Amino acid sequence: MDPTALVEAIVEEVACPICMTFLREPMSIDCGHSFCHSCLSGLWEIPGESQNWGYTCPLCRAPVQPRNLRPNWQLANVVEKVRLLRLHPGMGLKGDLCERHGEKLKMFCKEDVLIMCEACSQSPEHEAHSVVPMEDVAWEYKWELHEALEHLKKEQEEAWKLEVGERKRTATWKIQVETRKQSIVWEFEKYQRLLEKKQPPHRQLGAEVAAALASLQREAAETMQKLELNHSELIQQSQVLWRMIAELKERSQRPVRWMLQDIQEVLNRSKSWSLQQPEPISLELKTDCRVLGLREILKTYAADVRLDPDTAYSRLIVSEDRKRVHYGDTNQKLPDNPERFYRYNIVLGSQCISSGRHYWEVEVGDRSEWGLGVCKQNVDRKEVVYLSPHYGFWVIRLRKGNEYRAGTDEYPILSLPVPPRRVGIFVDYEAHDISFYNVTDCGSHIFTFPRYPFPGRLLPYFSPCYSIGTNNTAPLAICSLDGED
């Protein structure tokens, strides 16, 4: 092998594959490749990420464990010895001499973006071009390198944001799937428990549960695969960006001769680099939680719920039969009794729940905002209200026409393929069960709050929210369940 080529190969061997400069504090990983300690840290350290997160080698993509990183002292010694030769990775050993004329390379052709000697600059192909000393264009190209670097940094920041977003979406998906899985099990158990009080079971519920869970598992796996692919592609793009940024930083520190080497190719590649957006993936669960016949059982626990006008906020209009409520145009002159809500559009039912099972349905129609559920009898009605079980509220609500939530932001947004026009509420006091159902969607399950002992008596909760122009004006109406099939 030619000695010159051999030395060049050695110089390249002691360069970090990530930053393309001499290895600094070289670290070896499981697969045997070595990188700068700082490069690996920047590539792998993800704020707030667990150490159990999957890592791969930037070169061969082999799985590795960060805890197995080890310093490569022998390689570090070789790097220091090669550094004494005052060479740089990518420079080669032919130095500053023109291969054609043997003269020093010190001129630069602006049109062709080429380094050349004086003899080349006077040749016919360049005599009409603008050829200047290399130093005259050094700052111009340093600035272009800076602009390209800023562009890549912005792309890197966007890639990081997208990566964080994909991790959050993955976490949200896992929570939704686990919540739906729990709901399926609970709802079938509830059906069996309630049915045994009425008549012996006549269905193979175990097979129905297994089928529903199998469908959920298939859907979860398909979506999870897509989410993981998105995340993997973003990580790969981040790694490419990291290497390109490191290359530009290193190039800007080179002597002018080596900074300008192939400069146009580097700039074109950097400036044209564009982050590929992740594939849009719906997180809407298609496997619903639906138990055939459950609503018929729940209706046997129908409660005669009526609104208590003494609790109604001053702009809420309660019908004479106390079955409907809507938001009025003006404040009514009502006594400020202790039971009345002072700040919020809330009215409560008049019947206390302290034992037993109770079920009622409320027509919400095409309203864009509403809230339904139960609350403690002794909640604060004059100050700020937090719709959380911690503060005595078990409520689901619709906001902005399509955002369904259970309580406050402590629970994820609910996925409802069919917007409910009628909502069923079921309370089993002794079982600590507060559940909601989409009657419009054949009684599919909406949400069940985690089961904790209730801290006293409960009251039905209603909030028609505000009227928004001509929208959200229809009343909330408690439905009669008598005589229904």
From Swiss-Prot:
GO CC terms: cytoplasm; cytosol; Golgi apparatus; nucleolus; nucleoplasm; nucleus; perinuclear region of cytoplasm
CDD domains under this entry? Bbox2_TRIM68_C-IV, RING-HC_TRIM68_C-IV, SPRY_PRY_C-I_1
Q: Which residues form the B30.2/SPRY domain?
A: 285-481
Q: Name one GO molecular function term.
A: ubiquitin-protein transferase activity
Q: In which pathway does it act?
A: Protein modification; protein ubiquitination
Q: How would you describe the post-translational modification of this protein? A: Auto-ubiquitinated.
- Say yes or no: keyword Cytoplasm present: yes
Entries under SMART domains matching the protein: BBOX (SM00336), PRY (SM00589), RING (SM00184), SPRY (SM00449)
Q: Name one Pfam family in it.
A: SPRY
Task: Give me the residues that bind Zn(2+), please.
Answer: 98, 101, 120, 126
* Induction details: Up-regulated in prostate cancer.
What protein family is recorded?
A: Belongs to the TRIM/RBCC family.
PANTHER family assigned:
E3 UBIQUITIN-PROTEIN LIGASE TRIM
The extra comment attached to this record reads: Antibodies against TRIM68 are found in patients with systemic lupus erythematosus (SLE) and primary Sjoegren syndrome.
Q: What is this protein called?
A: E3 ubiquitin-protein ligase TRIM68
Q: Which organism is it from?
A: Homo sapiens
